[in-house]
Amino acid sequence: MEEIRESSNFIHDFVAEDIAPGGRFAGKTVHTRFPPEPNGYLHIGHCKALCIDFGTAEKFGGLCNLRMDDTNPAKEDTEFVDAIQEDIRWLGFDWGDRFFYGSDYFEKTYELAVGLIKKGLAYVCELTPEEFSAYRGDTTHPAVSPYRDRPIEESLDLFARMRAGEFPEGKYTLRAKIDLASGNFNMRDPVLYRIRYIEHHRQGTKWCIFPMYDLAHPIQDALEGITHSLCSLEYEDHRPLYNWVIENCDVPSKPRQIEFARLGINYTVMSKRKLRRLVEEGRVSGWDDPRMPTLCGLRRRGYTPHSIRDFTDRIGVSKVTSTVDYSLLESCLRDDLNANAKRVMAVLRPVKLTITNYPEGQTELFDVENNPVAENAGTRPVSFSRTLWVEQDDFMEEPVKKYNRLYPGNEVRLKGAYIVRCTGCVKDADGRVTEILCEYDPETRGGNTPDGRKVRGTIHWVDANNCANAEVRLYDMLFSDPEPDAPGKDFIDCLNPNSLETLTGCKVEKSLEDCTATDRFQFLRLGYFAPDNKDSAPGHLVFNRAVALKDSFKKD
């Protein structure tokens, strides 16, 4: 993994204090965890948490566990478990042998819940959610519960029968007995367990009661020896409950919860529910559609692990929620690919160019640089012949002002080859240009002018006698509105109808037939491109535009 520049954050400050002499974790190894819920694919928003969890452990020479938070059986699937692991490995992080499932702790969590009942700190409640809301009180009136003083033995019996499947969903819950007058409503006897008759992706039908996140999460952290439980800001007012569970359950360690602000990016949505709707309604081709903010979508589009880690590093860690410009993500990729991507020539909207005074049947090879900003990138041989492909918009029969490319009488430099002068064109019956006619100056091999004359325009080209055909997909923002998620909007109405343009019959250098899914290229003058890791195959090359050469962000 390439070096990412160092940036300070308050989490690292807290961790440094905790492991210093006299700190709460003095002498201990820093131990974090990344606990995704396997009910969808990871997206760029998760990436911030992922990089914070793994990055914090990495910085302090510690460990980071990967734990599937599968305590809620609804919509959890092994498909997502596998995809999450692939995404994390792709980013360059490693959890070693510390891969866990939250459901692995179901039995222990149940035992600890029984312990809370025995201590008089939990009770079985018969109130429905609607009824409890009525009993819950408000900021000036404490809550009340008719079941709060249920005898311990009765709660133990009912809880065991809940596990045995004797009651329907919604009949009973297990509640913590904390403080019905607390100003933090999360502490007003929160639900710890509920009845759900639903098959679990790993446990099958073994369990019909499932722990709530606020109970399961701190117990799992403590059982794994986590020192720092790093989570998003929405859990800040859940921290007292997290600490209450740790203090009152017989667990082997006492982790510290620290919260940070979530990542928001304009021109996108990151709700799993909304992303799932895009997939299910066929508005994108799948979770890995290159327009999606999922990591598999970004990878397919052409994003690199370094660019995404650089992005999370640049935005930093904060307690203040903010929205980041999508252009920053593009900039990180552009910087990475500018330094590392091989330069090649591709013609997306081809028109034939014939050099009328070039010998028929002759082919030359030119050594063309692979990357002018990379010292050891070297060169590659590119073939050149009488017939080339060039871009349609590199020719105008009647040029506009300051147009320096091909038009009758004008000279241009063919990148790395010769200088040619346009002598005319050939049109079809409808008046469309089908061929551009030029003459070359044989004294200008390599693009130099021995007589010192100035040639303003330089265009790219592909040898028509030695090239490959390709399909090229030009991607833009999935949404045309910078705030598709804003209140009062249906995000579907904000979809960009021009987010994808597919071009067929494109012409690329012959060498690209041997490219692999991990290769990244700069198509000269056109942008940065990557082979589509799903659709591209020998004999059918498909390239995705990962990012334009310049900032495409729409500014007011």
Summary of predicted features, one role per range:
Residues 66, 70-72, 115-275, 333, ...:
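Active-site cores that bind ATP or allylic diphosphates and position pyrophosphate for catalysis
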Residues 21-26, 55-63, 89-96, 119, ...:
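Secondary-structure transition/capping motifs at alpha-helix termini
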